[in-house]
């Protein structure tokens, strides 16, 4: 039988190790990117390193836009706004009780051209949603209760529903917040600089600094590797334990089979002596049988006194039979062990 617990632990250890290596490589890549301390230096850096493609840089600044979006509920101005609306209701389940559920009614997203500005210059940002670490903040969360119309309430109740209301959530990338972006720096046809996702290489958008990103990736890499070592040790332990148990079980079965064969041979020898001898020899063999009783083939100490159902064999004592699941003679499954009284 395959030790699935140990195999699963080893596979988990391999997956965690690969995650750790991936995080470690990402941290090493971020350490090699060109840091742009001031955005006005980007033009000079592009001219010096124009032969390097893609030219990966790390820039920092505050989010800005010429045409920001004003959120409807919170009034926050942002460059990316996502709005979702969920209908919340109670419904009848199969047991007849009411359970709460929800359904998505609306999912809308808006984005305007935006840039990073550090006071010295600005750089436009393209495709930030596909970047690692990109996240929007919750601008507002409003719950609008459903109207109490008698007709509508009756129809919903007949359908097994009770409308609670609509939950509207606005997520926004507000203007003015500081961001760090790691990506490919390019110069477009009209002479403006922009940061975009490279064909190969890292692409990060985060509110953390570059040093914090590298530190976090290093911590995750070490954590994954430590967890991988733990799962490896546990998996090896479980597999080794299974192998040892299997070896001991096979040895026990061989010893048990040897005991059964020895007992059967001894019993056959005694029966042959009793059938071929005279009455005196029968008496002598009876004495021998009394000297060598019908012992349990397991412990070889107690007389066998348990009959196995359904096979009908009797070769063990009641104490040993309580630990068996199959008959030592025919290997059939034991449904019941019945104690017998011998005279």
UniProtKB/Swiss-Prot annotation:
Residues 245-343 are cytoplasmic. Pathway: Protein modification; protein ubiquitination. Auto-ubiquitinated. GO terms for molecular function: ubiquitin-protein transferase activity; zinc ion binding. SUPFAM superfamilies: RING/U-box. Residues 22-222 are chloroplast intermembrane. Its EC number is 2.3.2.27. The chain crosses the membrane at residues 1-21, 223-244. InterPro entries: MUL1-like, SP1/SPL1, Znf_RING, Znf_RING/FYVE/PHD. It is an enzyme of class 2 (transferase). Induction: By infection with the bacterial pathogen Pseudomonas syringae pv. tomato, and treatment with fumonisin B1, a mycotoxin inducing apoptosis-like programmed cell death (PCD). The keyword Metal-binding applies. One of its GO terms (biological process) is protein ubiquitination. The keyword Cell division does not apply. A zinc finger (RING-type) spans 296-331. Keywords: Chloroplast, Membrane, Metal-binding, Plastid, Plastid outer membrane, Stress response, Transferase, Transmembrane, Transmembrane helix, Ubl conjugation, Ubl conjugation pathway, Zinc, Zinc-finger. Gene3D superfamilies: Zinc/RING finger domain, C3HC4 (zinc finger). Disruption phenotype: No visible phenotype under normal growth conditions, but mutant plants show increased disease symptoms and cell death after inoculation with an avirulent strain of Pseudomonas syringae pv. tomato DC3000. Pale-green phenotype with low survival rates during de-etiolation. Hypersensitivity to salt, osmotic, and oxidative stresses. It is a multi-pass membrane protein. It is found in: Plastid, Chloroplast outer membrane. It catalyses: S-ubiquitinyl-[E2 ubiquitin-conjugating enzyme]-L-cysteine + [acceptor protein]-L-lysine = [E2 ubiquitin-conjugating enzyme]-L-cysteine + N(6)-ubiquitinyl-[acceptor protein]-L-lysine. Interacts with TOC33, TOC75-3 and TOC159. E3 ubiquitin-protein ligase involved in the regulation of protein import in the chloroplast. Associates with TOC complexes and mediates ubiquitination of TOC components, promoting their degradation via the ubiquitin-proteasome system (UPS). Plays a role in the reorganization of the TOC machinery. Involved in a mechanism that regulates plastid biogenesis via UPS. Promotes stress tolerance by depleting the chloroplast protein import apparatus, which limits photosystem assembly and the potential for reactive oxygen species (ROS) formation. The zinc finger domain is required for E3 ligase activity. This is E3 ubiquitin-protein ligase SP1. It comes from Arabidopsis thaliana. The gene is SP1.
